[in-house]
Amino acid sequence: MDFVLSALQRDSWGIAAIILVSIWALHSFHRSRKLQIPVPYVGKCGILGPWISALQWESKARELVQEGYEKHGNFAFKVALLNRWEVCICNEDMIREYKNLMDNQFSAIAVTSELFQIKWTAPGTEEGAHKISIPLLGKALTWQRNRSAAQNDPYFSEFVEEFLYAWKEEVPVPENGDYELPCFETGARVVAHLTARSLVGYPLCRNPEIVNLFTDYGSAVPTSGFFIAMFPEIMKPFVANFCSAPRISKRLQAILLEEFAKRREEGGIESTDIMGWLRNWTDQNEPGVYGDLEITSSIIATIFGAIHTTTQVLVHCLFELATRPEYVEPLRVEIQSALEEHGGWVKEGIEGMVKLDSFIKECQRFNPLDAGSLARRATKDFTFKNGLTIPEGTFVFAPNGPILFDDTLYPEARQFDGYRFYNLGQKTGKPQDFRFAATNQKYLQFGDGRHTCPGRWMASDEIRLMLAHILMNYDIATKDNKGRPENWIFKKILFPDMKAVVILKARKSVSA
């Protein structure tokens, strides 16, 4: 990747590091091959086949996962990485069996810790650290979600207010003429404003440094994490000193700890945001167990997932809208109707935009972030009911991308249908099962089971609010009508073009 190459070019020790990393990777892979995992192998054949496939993983991972799903979709298969085997569990019963296991059997945080090198990029939240649990963070987000739905609670109106403030700050569209919107850059900053409002509240969310740090941290975690992961454990403390995520994390920690102290001086900590709610809930229910440091660490770790993934879905939606004009007017009609029926930009109005919700979900389905989902590491030997044993230390995942393009599950899956999920909801009489934030084993974008993404409801509100605002106030097109910007792939991950722009032009007549 570009960030890896540029990092190596900046440092005189780059060549030596590559040699050391290569030796370490070969040693690790040789050691991992001794693990006996009795599932079919997918990749190059022959004595050197696994080595070649491992070297091609960065560019061929999604193809290998698709091939494995097509050949072994009723069971499981393994693929070779430079330092280990990974096992893809395809069988529905087996997925159901492992997705709800406790972390002391199949650990999700272990995967995240290794992929993004959380020990260095989000210290205090790595595997084994004393930290706020994911279920407790989920409880906090559920509290906030319930506030959004409560008619007499000001939270959602404040959320809309924050969006309008962020849009005005970040998107200077002229009254006349075109405006080139840098989709990812601007989207990330707007989402950072909203994430800050949710996590740390007003007025801290209006602090320009906080917005900058939230935005930068969302990008720094994957780039720093991927770079640090290239090196043996003994070199990582040294390498981390050259990466931005640890520095940003340290600065955020200082600001948030200072905020706690300030709130106490000014009369106490109120439950008006996630940070305050966690402080009060833990004081009341688990006094003395968690300090300010554990709470602020959990807030910081939440930032990456909250900003980067939400922004990517938003960008895909903008690209699809700009190149599929047939959806624009019908969606505007629905948005206008929902706003009029419910009295403006209120929670009920956003929930009434069911075709817009379907369009967003189809954009996500058609451009799946990860070819896999439900990634776990076996923390002890585990035997499935069908007799397959997964050795301790093995990484497993379930197919995601291949499921979303399986014609037996999604008819004409290679065709984009913005109303696909709306129609499925109407046909089955269960519209809630097909909303953007809904999950099941046929739609694993947010995971499923024990570690389902707890922030998906907030992401849904953010994306619907932004797209509805754009549709009602602007015409949208690609630059020079050149077509949809191309996605790019790294390993199993698919990214939108992060440099691409769309053209916004203020509409002459806006009734919303």
From Swiss-Prot:
One GO CC annotation: membrane
Keywords per UniProt: Heme, Iron, Membrane, Metal-binding, Monooxygenase, Oxidoreductase, Transmembrane, Transmembrane helix
Keyword Signal: no
Metabolic or biological pathway, per its Swiss-Prot or TrEMBL entry: Secondary metabolite biosynthesis
A GO molecular-function descriptor: monooxygenase activity
Cited Pfam families: p450
KO phenotype (gene knockout): Impairs the production of paxilline. Leads to the accumulation of the 13-desoxypaxillin intermediate.
UniProt-listed Enzyme Commission number(s): 1.-.-.-
Top-level lineage group: Eukaryota
Bilayer topology: Multi-pass membrane protein
Keyword Protein biosynthesis carried by entry: no
Cofactor(s) listed: heme
Bilayer-crossing regions: 3-23, 35-55
Annotated localization: Membrane
Family (UniProt): Belongs to the cytochrome P450 family.
Protein name: Cytochrome P450 monooxygenase paxQ
Native source species: Penicillium paxilli
Gene: paxQ
